Amino acid sequence: FFFSSRRRHTRYWRDWSSDVCSSDLVVIASACRTAIGKMGGALSNTPAADLGAIVIKEALNRAGVAPEMVDEVKMGCVIQAAQGQNVARQASIKAGLPIEVPAITINVVCGSGLKCVNDAATMIKAGEADIVVAGGMENMSMAPYAMTKARFGYRMNNATIIDTMVNDALTDAFNHYHMMITAENVCDKYGITREELDEFSANSQQKCEAAIAAGKFDDEIVPVPVKVKKEIVEFKKDEGPRAGTTVETLSKLRCCSGKEGGLVTAGNASGINDGAAAVVVMSEEKAKELGVKPLATWVAGALGGVEPRHFLYLNLHYHKNTQYETDFTYLGFDGLHGRSFGSGTGCSSKQNHRNRSNG
């Protein structure tokens, strides 16, 4: 592993068999997630705070960290309407952490969970904490509808009901159009074709199908108890992946973005999902003190901003910021994973890494 500081531009290499350690290294001690539920699926009646509590508790258990040892909890959550105050605080207390442990909910839309991880690492590097739980939680299925003028009355004419899922999570607040249009904008900007989108999506689905069949995700998934009719069963299999997806099956789907001649379909766009994930972040010294064998070393994180209508290009911006911060390239990695809103983002940001992306 290596770490690089923007100020020093010094690279540190770490061999876990060595007794020598660098004091400013940050590690991931454990990680877990729920299976991902589709809209209206198995998790549709489980609040985001409950999902968050499940993964926080399990992440601590896997790391062998007692709840009272945690300095802070940071959890991302985008759709917070009608969820109650500070969803992260709810999840923290439901997970059994002491009331003295502070918790903060972060919303930078798609990047919320990873922003929590980066902030946790920054706190630890600054000496403000030794152990932080970070992650994200969301239940899009439970997003409520809102009537913004109902409090003082509509008096006359029709009332508008706002879908908080679409309004707060899936609509560009500046241009007032759906995220699917921003995906179309990226395709226009980079000359991406429908065939490329479908090929990328089919490849991603096939990799996921193979990984599920091989049990690659089994260890990271925490079962969630859900009620099915009169029984309580364990939900532990992702609902989003479609087995048997091919370029041919995807090519038959109609555009759903509303744009004439559009390229985005239900098959090459992101799903609407419910789920949660959490990691335990700590200093290397604390990991050594506790006898924890880290899963990974946190190297760097970056946040960027671009023109809202092209915000799905942000993946490239993050990559450039991270490369500046750490002075490394992606050429040395066998695999890359990118968070993106559908294959439009994937095609635009991974053209040079297609064979190693999300594999």
Indicate where each model-derived feature is located.
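Single conserved hydrophobic/aromatic residue that forms the stacking wall/gate
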Residues: 1-21
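Conserved active-site "lid/cap" helical segment
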Residues: 23-83, 87-95, 99-102, 182-194, ...
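N-terminal extracellular/periplasmic Venus flytrap/periplasmic-binding protein-like
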Residues: 32-34, 44-54, 62, 196-289, ...
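Conserved catalytic cysteine-centered active-site region
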Residues: 74-131, 173-178, 244-271
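Active-site-proximal alpha-helical scaffold in enzymes
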Residues: 108-138, 187-216, 278-285
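Flexible glycine-/small-residue-enriched beta->alpha junction loops
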Residues: 131-185
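Cationic, amphipathic, low-complexity alpha-helical segments enriched
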Residues: 312-316, 331, 336-339, 350, ...
